[in-house]
UniProtKB/Swiss-Prot annotation:
Keyword Transit peptide attributed: no
Enzyme class, broadest EC rank: hydrolase
Catalysed conversion reaction: 1-aminocyclopropane-1-carboxylate + H2O = 2-oxobutanoate + NH4(+)
Gene from which this protein is expressed: acdS
Species per Swiss-Prot/TrEMBL record: Burkholderia orbicola (strain MC0-3)
Keywords linked to the UniProt accession: Hydrolase, Pyridoxal phosphate
Protein name as catalogued: 1-aminocyclopropane-1-carboxylate deaminase
Alphabetical list of Gene3D superfamilies matching this protein: 3.40.50.1100
Length: 338
């Protein structure tokens, strides 16, 4: 496997820490050891997160093309767009963000706080659009890029989650290589890695990275899109493309992509009672914050799988914490009383 042939622009602090979740593990019976890899603490750029790791491989391409404006898209409370805005500010570039109405949640301050507030503070041109949720290529995003061209700028396209970008899977191939190095220091290997999946490139990169040592199917995706077939197809397609890029040396097959579809409901961006319980439990036992859109759902999935005995006794499970806590203030009505 050859990830090193791709240029990387450092935006993160370095390897993200792996934290034992001792109290949560004990609360769930102590038969499974839970750990978290803290991608939510990976950068000083506006709280970082998993997209910052991906953007390290997109930035060299943007600079090589002479782009002056990063153009990205997400929902109103998108973590992706906040991280793109931070990277643009860091590089001295302009930033245009399309924020679509992906979540059927109404709150008077939903479009004024959290991620979108931070993006505005960092100088991004934020454009609210009423279109609903979809993980594919969006007309509103293409129109935003054309508007930059018409104004004489040179846009660089960054699709939702970086996922439809040809280089979008590379960052999390690097995640897997990083975990292997940390496992050597820890003296054990993780039996499973749990990760939230929506647009797909985070899990796709992990699948490719862990395929290098035969653990592709030990990456357990927890769907948070509530459109699991579209997400599964996108993960598989991105993983196959990424495997070719890094010269993995074997094909990615359908069995490599494991996606648990039980925790995405009731719909994208809206938490179930189980998700809310998981968010509060994790916060109160570990002081670790997760959100109702992404990490709360993957945390719900991991907790439930432990309770159901779906991890063998003695298993060591690594939870990939991708970020998302900056969106919590947008859901203040739900968490008014904690």
């Amino acid at each position: 496997m050859n990830l090193q042939r791709f240029p990387r622009y450092p935006l993160t602090f370095g390897p993200t820490p792996i934290q034992p979740l001792k109290r949560l593990s004990a609360h769930l019976g102590g038969k499974v050891e839970l750990y978290a890899k803290r991608e939510d603490c990976n950068s000083g750029l506006a709280f970082g997160g998993n997209k910052t790791r991906k953007l390290e491989y997109l930035v060299p391409d943007a600079l090589a093309q002479g782009a002056d404006t990063l153009v990205s898209i997400g929902g109103v409370q998108s973590n992706q767009t906040r991280q793109v805005a931070a990277v643009a500010a860091h590089l001295g570039m302009k930033c245009v963000l399309v924020q679509e109405h992906w979540v059927n949640y109404e709150d008077p301050v939903y479009d004024r706080v959290g991620n979108i507030q931070l993006s505005r503070m960092m100088g991004a041109d934020v454009r609210l659009v009423s279109d609903g949720f979809d993980i594919g290529i969006r007309r509103s995003w293409e129109e935003a890029m054309e508007s930059v061209r018409q104004a004489g700028g040179k846009p660089y396209p960054i699709p939702a989650g970086c996922s439809e970008h040809p280089l979008g899977g590379l960052g999390f191939v690097g995640f897997a290589e990083e975990v292997r190095a940390q496992e050597a220091q820890l003296g054990f290997k993780f039996d499973y890695v749990v990760v939230c999946s929506v647009t797909g490139s985070t899990q796709a990169g992990m699948v490719v990275g862990f395929a290098a040592d035969g653990r592709a199917d030990r990456v357990i995706g927890i769907d948070a899109s509530a459109k699991p077939e579209q997400t599964r197809e996108q993960i598989t397609r991105i993983a196959r493309h990424t495997a070719e890029l890094v010269e993995l040396g074997r094909d990615i097959v359908e069995q490599d992509v494991v996606l648990d579809t039980r925790y995405g409901g009731p719909e994208y961006g809206l938490p179930s009672d189980g998700t809310l319980e998981a968010i509060r439990l994790c916060a109160r036992l570990e002081g670790m914050l997760t959100d109702p859109v992404y990490e709360g759902k993957s945390m719900h999935g991991m907790i439930d799988k432990v309770r159901l005995g779906e991890f063998e006794p003695g298993s060591k499970v690594l939870y990939a914490h991708l970020g998302g806590a900056p969106a919590l203030s947008a859901y203040n009505g739900i968490f008014r009383n904690g």
